[in-house]
Curated annotation (Swiss-Prot):
Heterodimer of an alpha and a beta chain. GO terms for biological process: DNA recombination; regulation of DNA-templated transcription; regulation of translation. The keyword Metal-binding does not apply. NCBIfam families: hip, PRK00199.1. It comes from Granulibacter bethesdensis (strain ATCC BAA-1260 / CGDNIH1). This protein is one of the two subunits of integration host factor, a specific DNA-binding protein that functions in genetic recombination as well as in transcriptional and translational control. This is Integration host factor subunit beta. The keyword DNA-binding applies. It holds the Pfam family Bac_DNA_binding. The lineage of its organism: Bacteria, Pseudomonadati, Pseudomonadota, Alphaproteobacteria, Acetobacterales.
Length: 107
C-alpha cells in the first residue's frame, strides 16, 4: 500500500473528511514520527509496534561490481519492531490467504 492508497482508503472510510484533510493528517503523523526519530526519541504505537534508531558501526565494505574495498562510515538508521497484536494479525491473515506474506499483501 502506498501513501496515496492509504489516503484514499482513509477517505473512503471517513466520507465526512475531505481528501486534503486526510492527506494533511497522514503527512503530519509521518512528519511527527520522523522528527521524533531525528531527535533520537522512540515512537511506540501500542499494539502496532515501535520505531527506534539503531547505530551501525563503521566498517570495511566491498564494491560488488569491482571487488574493491571501501570504507563505510558509521550511520544511524530507523528500525521498526512490530508489536504483538500486529504480528498476530499478520500471521492469522497469511494463514487464511494461503500461508504467504505475498498473499496477504495482494502481491
Amino acid at each position: 500500500m502506498t501513501k496515496s492508497e492509504l489516503i484514499a482508503s482513509l477517505k473512503a472510510d471517513n466520507p465526512h473528511l475531505t481528501e486534503r484533510d486526510v492527506e494533511t493528517i497522514v503527512s503530519t503523523i509521518f512528519d511527527e514520527i520522523s522528527n521524533a526519530l531525528a531527535r533520537g526519541a522512540r515512537v511506540e504505537l501500542r499494539g502496532f509496534g515501535a520505531f527506534t534508531i539503531k547505530r551501525r558501526d563503521a566498517r570495511v565494505g566491498r564494491n560488488p561490481r569491482t571487488g574493491e574495498t571501501v570504507s563505510v562510515d558509521e550511520k544511524v538508521v530507523p528500525f521498526f519492531k512490530a508489536g504483538k497484536e500486529l504480528r498476530e494479525r499478520v500471521n492469522n491473515g497469511t494463514r487464511k490467504n494461503g500461508g504467504s506474506a505475498d498473499a496477504a499483501s495482494g502481491g
